Amino acid sequence: MATEAQPAKQAKLLLVEDDVLIRMLLADMLDEIGYTVAAEAASIDEALEATRKTDFDLAILDADLDGRSVSPVADALVARDIGFVFVTGYDDHGLFAYRDRPTLKKPFQIDALKRCCKSALSSH
């Protein structure tokens, strides 16, 4: 019985989300659409460390980490010229300086995640 070949991994991602269950779900979704999660972070400090120590092509950022804005992480990514996508449960992620960045409003479907990642990767 033949099995379907798995798609080649397209890119390595940094996943920044403070809710462990959402982070696990996002990691599974990213794997399903062919991306490799290079590192995960649950806090701003962990995310900043990952930006310094991990090789990745794109970041998925929860806009609010335990009540703190993720803007220091976004600033670090801009300095390294690495694209990112915001995910948020709010209507507005509150990061005016980054209003032009792709944003997914939770909950979202896997197809929306795939389109958003592809778009963010192609623009960087």
Locations of regions flagged by a protein language model:
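Two-component/phosphorelay signaling modules centered on CheY-like receiver
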Residues: 20-39
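Acidic, metal-coordinating helix/loop segments flanking the phosphotransfer/catalytic sites
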Residues: 40-58
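Active-site residues of response regulator receiver
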Residues: 62
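Short amphipathic alpha-helix used as the core "switch/output" element in two-component signaling
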Residues: 68-82
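Hydrophobic/aromatic residues positioned on beta-strands within the core alpha/beta folds
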Residues: 87-88
